[in-house]
Amino acid sequence: MSGLRLDGKIAIITGGASGIGAEAVRLFTDHGAKVVIVDFQEELGQNVAVSVGKDKASFYRCDVTNEKEVENAVKFTVEKYGKLDVLFSNAGVMEQPGSFLDLNLEQFDRTMAVNVRGAAAFIKHAARAMVEKGTRGSIVCTTSVASEIGGPGPHAYTASKHALLGLVKSACGGLGKYGIRVNGVAPYAVATAINSRDEETVRMVEEYSAATGILKGVVLKARHVAEAALFLASDDSAYVSGQNLAVDGGYSVVKPI
């Protein structure tokens, strides 16, 4: 029996040029998948594709807020590989924390456009491709501990992740009849490009995560989140749908709200 959990599978990973997405590209290809890296960061995305091998990964530049570009990214994948088995909708943005009294509605709209509308567009077009080919696919969205509770994240980010979790549950209900599973993976504070500009910021985020987290002795890394996404993408979770898999060391379960 093969130990490759995505052997022969075709996957799209949005936000795949860095952070959790880049780790997922490496992990998914290690497990036998062919991956299309979707991101607007062309140089970084191409570098990730080269690092895993152009025979295993391709890069497609896309603004997730533009539905036509999203549709074309899915079309590119199906034309290149013949099908689509997995969507890991991971692209996201986060605004700077601040007082709700000073809420910047332009930033709010941008955050919702990327984190919710972008995910909705990819789920829509990926699901269409899966249904057309008769593929019992898996869709995984990066949510957050902020999709379940308020407080840990900035206001627009928290609102967007709550909405994204609702989208996951709604899509689960709407796509189950086609054999398509839809789940979320919900990390606690993990240092990625979304919140860390340099090594000093990475250190600060990891120190915050270690100090405020429940599970001690482990520092949450992007790789841990990618491993959870791999489980949800693979047939190991064949009867799991509509769930929001927490990768938070117990934070959302026991942390006082």
From Swiss-Prot:
Keyword Oxidoreductase attached: yes
Keyword Membrane appears in the UniProt entry: no
Keywords: Hypersensitive response, Oxidoreductase, Plant defense
GO biological process, any: plant-type hypersensitive response
Top-level class of the enzyme under EC nomenclature: oxidoreductase
Tissues of expression: Highly expressed in the radicle tip, lateral root primordia and tips, and the area surrounding the cotyledon hydathode of young seedlings.
Gene inactivation effect: No phenotype regarding abiotic stresses. Enhanced susceptibility to the incompatible pathogenic bacteria Pseudomonas syringae pv. tomato DC3000.
GO MF term (any one): oxidoreductase activity
Gene3D superfamilies hit by this protein: NAD(P)-binding Rossmann-like Domain
Entry binding sites for NAD(+): 12-36
Signal peptide annotation: none
Top-level taxon in the UniProt lineage: Eukaryota
Active site: Y157 (proton acceptor)
Positions of substrate binding: S144
Protein EC: 1.1.1.-
Induction context: Accumulates upon Pseudomonas syringae infection and after treatment with systemic acquired resistance (SAR)-inducing chemicals, 1,2-benzisothiazol-3(2H)-one1,1-dioxide (BIT) and benzo-(1,2,3)thiadiazole-7-carbothioic acid S-methyl ester (BTH).
Pfam families: adh_short_C2
Function: Confers resistance to the incompatible pathogenic bacteria P.syringae pv. tomato DC3000 in a PR1-dependent manner. Seems not involved in abscisic acid (ABA) biosynthesis.
UniProt record similarity statement: Belongs to the short-chain dehydrogenases/reductases (SDR) family.
Protein name as annotated: Short-chain dehydrogenase reductase 3a
Organism: Arabidopsis thaliana (Mouse-ear cress)
